Structures are given as C-alpha cells and as structure tokens.
Design a protein with these regions (language model features):
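Extended active-site neighborhood of metal-dependent phosphoesterases/phosphodiesterases
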Residues: 27-43, 107-190, 215-229, 237-273
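Short, acidic Ser/Thr/Gly-rich low-complexity loop/linker segments typical of extracellular
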Residues: 2-11
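Active-site glycine-centered loops adjacent to acidic/histidine catalytic or metal-binding residues
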Residues: 69, 99-100, 128-129, 201, ...
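N-terminal active-site segment of His-dependent metallophosphoesterases
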Residues: 22-109
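Short Pro-Gly-centered beta-turn/loop motif in secreted/extracellular proteins
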Residues: 13-22
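His/acidic metal-ligating clusters that form di-metal
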Residues: 85-94, 170-248, 300-312, 316-327
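Long, low-complexity serine/threonine/glycine- and acidic-rich segments characteristic of extracellular
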Residues: 311, 322-345
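Binuclear metal-dependent phosphoesterase catalytic core
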Residues: 246-316, 320-325
C-alpha cells in the first residue's frame, strides 16, 4: 500500500497496513533480482533484497514478450518450447503472463515451467479472473505461489505497473480503493521524464480518457503520467488500437488461438529510444519454413538486363529470420551462376 524511497545505503522504513502480506521492491532499470517480494512474517524486523547489475534491463530501447490465458489445467504443451527458444534467440528484457493461469491445477503447475530460470529472463505474472480460487480469499493461492497481485518495475525509461483484475470466480480481499491507494503512491515515485505502461488481465481503463476510478472521490488520470500503453488478455482475441497516443493492446492465446479465429500466438512489444512502442504477433507451432515467391515454376521472371528479382517468404516460431542465402544454377548442367544473400524488405 505504502511506497517509499530508500536512503543512500538502501535502507527503508514503511508505515504499517492491516492487509500487508508482502514487501516488494520496484526493481530499478539496469538491475535484476531473483525475487522482488518477500512475505511478511511476524517478528521479522528487516527485509533485504539482493540486486545484480543487468545489461538487458538498462537500455532505453528494449523489447518484451506478453503471453496470456494459457489456462493449463490439462497440462503444458509444445508452445512452451517455442516460447522458450524465442526468448533464448531474441533476448527480450522480460516476459509477462497477463493472467488466467488457471484454477488450482494451473496455478500450481505453471510457475514450475515458465519462470526466470527456465526462460532465462525475468518473468512476471498478473492475476486473472480464473486465478481467484476457493480459499480464505480469492487470491490466497495465487499469492502463495506468485506473490503480490500489484507491483511495479523499471526497464530503460519505462515504469511498468502490474494491477489486479477487479472481478473473478471468487471474492478478492483487495478492493478498488486499495488498488487506487497503492497506485497513487507508486506513480508518485516516477521520475519526471519517465513513461508508463500498464498491465492487467482485463481492460483496466475503458474509453479514451484513461481514467481509473475507485469511486467518485478517488480518481487517477493516466494521461498525466505519460502513459504509452495498457496491455491485457482475458478476451481471447487480438486487438490493437491507438487512442490519441496511448495504445490499448489485447492479446489472444498462444496455445489454442483466439475466438476471433486468429492463430495461436504470443506478442512482442518493442520500445524505441523515445519510449514509442511497436508490436507484432509471433505465431506458435510453426517449424522453419521457406518458400520461393518469385520466380515461380513455369513462369517467366521479370528479369531486367542481368538482374533477376528473387523473393522468398520465411518463418519460424522460435526465432526471427536473420538472413537468407541463395544459389542460382543452370537447370541443365547444374552449373552455379550466382550466389549471395537476399535483402530483407
């Protein structure tokens, strides 16, 4: 609930809050930690966090991967390998799962397979409506495995904020007022020139105003915090909309496709040196493919002088295409005529 800055020696003191179950840190840009939160224990007087320097969380230009709604109650699938290899090859700054992990079996299983060690990058989670399960309160099991339902971290010049869904299969212990109070305190610590990206399992702020309203008296206008995007899942479809400079981005599932008939996919988001974002989907379950588009069999090519345009399509679920090489040979005697690398368009 309360948010404070450490002193020069890294020491801090937090006021109490009756619902406090975790002490968490906003991991600063240029650093990583194996655990950004610690459970609160009775009679414990200090909470210490170990930070290590990190080159991948420092650059203003960086990328991250979003997955969502894996709903792994029946077990994990081949998508895990595609995701793992893509992260290994493309080296995003972090991976985030925006909720619906799902139910007791999924909650207990998912973090054993998709975590910072198996993915070799920081991994974060949001709580979804199907992650609010039976217990003393809906988020109890989630918290015991994944930690707090709200937290933040910095990478490059972006302040990333994870927020909890406000509804689900079982009642939550947190309220929208609790979320507002923490958000207000957290955002107050942003640096003057920082930008903001928000995560939630569902659409956090509907409409073009980007206002979070806990009640009539407690309101946050995210446009005043240089917000660049809000990302979510829940709907099982792919959607990107630029709303007067702020992107609203919904991502479908990488294991079963979307209800909009979109293929199974996860999302990569790139942040440039001015904090502007671009995004593309990466499709799962696709083995390395290459197809010559032009010239085609039994067709006359559009050759000009000694130039022969060659066009190919390539794709692989586990990596982007780095280059395409070619060899041109005489069909009658198989003699090599030319070879080289094609230029990406």
């Amino acid at each position: 609930m309360n948010v404070v800055k450490t002193d020069k020696k890294g020491r801090f003191s937090l006021p109490g809050f009756e619902k406090t179950r975790f002490i968490s840190i906003t991991t600063p840009a240029g650093f990583e930690t194996q655990q950004f939160y610690l459970p609160v224990k009775e009679n414990r007087k200090s909470y210490d966090f170990l930070l290590t320097e990190s080159e991948r969380t420092q650059p203003r230009e960086h990328s991250f991967v979003q997955i969502t709604d894996t709903e792994v109650t029946g077990g994990m699938g081949r998508w895990v390998t595609d995701l793992q290899q893509y992260v290994k090859n493309e080296k995003p700054a972090f991976l985030i799962h925006t909720g619906d992990i799902c139910y007791e079996p999924g909650l207990k299983m998912h973090n054993q397979v998709v975590n910072a060690e198996t993915m070799n990058c920081p991994v974060y989670y949001c709580i979804g409506n199907h992650d609010l399960v039976k217990g003393n309160y809906g988020e109890e099991l989630y918290e015991s495995i994944y930690g707090p339902t709200w937290y933040s971290f910095d990478i490059g010049n972006i302040h990333y904020v994870v927020t909890p869904i406000d509804h689900g299969d079982n009642p939550t212990d947190y309220t929208q007022r609790d979320v507002y109070n923490w958000l207000k305190n957290d955002l107050a610590m942003m640096k003057k020139d920082q930008s903001l990206i928000l995560f939630n399992h569902d659409l956090f702020t509907p409409g073009d105003t980007f206002v979070f309203k806990a009640d009539n008296e407690h309101i946050l206008d995210f446009r005043t915090f240089n917000t660049k995007a809000q990302l979510y899942g829940h709907m099982h479809y792919n959607y990107v909309r630029n709303q007067n400079g702020i992107y609203t981005i919904c991502t479908g599932t990488l294991d079963k496709g979307g209800i909009d008939h979109s293929p199974s996919s996860f999302r990569e988001i790139k942040v440039d040196g001015n904090d502007n974002i671009t995004t593309q989907l990466r499709y799962t379950f696709i083995e390395p493919q290459i197809a010559i588009v032009s010239p085609m069999n039994n067709q006359i090519s559009a050759a000009t002088g000694d130039r022969l345009p060659v066009s190919v399509n390539t794709y692989h679920a586990q990596a982007k295409t780095s280059h395409v090489s070619y060899i041109l040979s005489d069909i009658e005697n198989n003699q090599e005529i030319a070879k080289g690398n094609l230029i990406s368009l």
